A protein has these predicted regions:
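Beta-rich interaction/scaffold domains
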Residues: 2-28
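Ser/Thr/Pro-rich, low-complexity mucin-like regions
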Residues: 9-12, 154, 168-172
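Aromatic (Trp/Tyr/Phe) and Gly/Pro-enriched flexible surface segments
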Residues: 23-141, 169-223, 228-229, 234-248, ...
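Extended, hydrophobic/aromatic-rich amphipathic alpha-helical segments that build helical scaffolds
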Residues: 141-144, 148-149
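Short amphipathic, basic-aromatic surface patches that mediate peripheral association
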Residues: 148-167
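A generic structural signal for short coil/turn motifs at secondary-structure boundaries
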Residues: 155, 252-255
Length: 273
């Protein structure tokens, strides 16, 4: 297979080389999660780690920085970090944090760890719109593969309720999925799905989703087939985006999950043709 090396200049103008494999006719989108860089969050916030390549992979750390002011008495910590003991090299460790002790905890009682293809752009008025899922994808996706470990936390919190409820008789689960969606609407305008509509949008075409989000103590491999939504087919004349989305709490977007639920993912890969 052909192995191409791209030089990418990041925002701090350090040139890094990334290796992208293109194997035969089958196009493989692969993230080894070995390379991470420290993101400068500015003088008011603690820095955090972000996976490479930037612009392709993002995390929920960008939102959690508001809970980690450098002079703040209460710091919640960051929900996504590099796991050095990955399945192969580094991996991504996603943790659901109880953020109720922070002044902003009323807005976000829990902060789940999420890793996704796309970009994070903080929207304080509509937090779910901060996660802009998906990157351009020009193949028909067939399989979504990877390895993971998961351990649900013990104190399940429902932050969607006022007042917040905790200690609920619910066992948390992780969420791992890949979604193919149309990149343009009928008038040719760009479509980008966010935390608001990634699970409901009419632009979704196919999805590969892990059915079993329960605890897995040992590294567990998954190989998921893309299933098409009703009345949807792949059309090679259309433009598409592909969103890989992993979360330490499957309902974290609704501020529901267990404190300390931990998902570790590695070697994520989408095979298309």
């Amino acid at each position: 297979y052909k192995r191409q090396v791209y030089s990418v200049v990041s925002e701090d103008v350090t040139s890094r080389k990334y290796t992208v494999s293109i194997e035969g006719v089958q196009n493989i989108m692969r993230y080894s999660l070995d390379e991470w860089s420290e993101f400068d969050a500015g003088s008011s916030y603690d820095n955090y780690w972000t996976p490479e390549p930037a612009g392709f992979l993002a995390t929920s750390n960008g939102g959690a920085k508001m809970l980690n002011g450098s002079s703040s008495a209460v710091k919640v910590g960051y929900p996504v970090m590099k796991e050095t003991e990955g399945f192969n090299g580094g991996a991504a460790k996603l943790v659901t944090l109880d953020s109720r002790g922070h002044a902003l905890g009323s807005l976000a009682p829990i902060t789940s760890g999420s890793l996704f293809t796309g970009v994070f752009s903080l929207n304080m008025l509509a937090p779910l719109k901060s996660t802009k899922f998906g990157i351009a994808y020009d193949k028909e996706p067939k399989l979504f593969k990877g390895v993971y470990k998961y351990k649900a936390g013990t104190n399940y919190i429902d932050g969607s309720k006022k007042p917040v409820e905790e200690g609920l008789d619910v066992v948390d689960e992780c969420s791992i999925a890949a979604v193919l969606y149309e990149a343009k609407d009928a008038s040719g305008k760009d479509v980008t799905l966010t935390g608001v509509d990634i699970n409901t949008s009419e632009y979704r075409v196919a999805e590969a989703r892990l059915k079993d989000g329960t605890d897995k103590e040992a590294w567990t491999a998954f190989e998921l087939t893309f299933e098409y939504f009703p009345d949807k087919v792949y059309d090679s004349t259309k433009e598409y985006k592909l969103a890989i989305v992993c979360s330490s709490s499957k309902e974290g977007d609704k501020f529901k999950g267990a404190a300390n639920s931990t998902l570790i993912v590695d070697e994520l890969e989408v095979v298309g043709e």
